[in-house]
Amino acid sequence: MFKELDRLGYEAYLDKYPFHRELGIDLKAYIKEKGGLNKKSLKNKSESVDVNNKVPYPVELDDLIRLHFLVTTRKVTTILEFGVGKSTKVFDHALNVNKNKYESYVTNNLRRSNKFECHSVDTSRKWIKTTRKQFQTDNVRYHYTKCHVSTFNGRICTMYKKLPNICPDFIYLDAPDQYSPRGNVRGISTRHADRLPMAGDLLAIEHFLLPGTLIAVDGRTANARFLRANFQRSWRYHYFKNFDQHFFELDESPLGVWNNRQMKFTSAEDK
């Protein structure tokens, strides 16, 4: 999945698409502090489960590079993002790249009603406002909604109250956190430091997704395993342990002529 990126190199990719500048990241200082683009920062045991933590996690530039790479190389047209933040700006930048290259072809040859749009869902009006203020975007639509503890086929999980009515070809799952979902089922909720995020929204919309759709799950291993155990269609699954990301690709034959065109467009190499 990332062989081309590994061959090119992460720094070379940023030279080609310097989106880090729009994030306000000093690349030399970042590399010096981290010891390299691929070095991970070890979080303390409570950082990701502290209900009082209001500080965004430090940027992981290598993760953002991979997301940008996937959007540009797969010629993604419509993104559904769970959780706003720096990734939102990265998706906006990557969609601009795709729009500049492929807008004419997509408009004239594919059936994409929300072409070159990123729809970002979040439970926090504050973080949406902060992200809007911090990053100017051309292609992002923000969606505030509540999230509740619910069930899928009797299994406890969380569900957003409302999702954007779109047909994404790329989905990024990085939310909700443990403490945003409200309510409980038989006394069980995710609002506990020893619980785990367990979003079930993608299971509910699975049969609306088109063959070729790619899902990226950032960390959230228990959630990724929950999805894998409950998906009903034919998904190819990849887990990259060294950077803790999970990927699901809907590996089915095209649904019809328009889906077939899109899949060929996505897989075709630029000349």
PLM regions: where:
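Class I SAM-dependent methyltransferase Rossmann-like catalytic core
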Residues: K28-K75, K89-H93
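Conserved class I S-adenosyl-L-methionine
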Residues: K75-G85
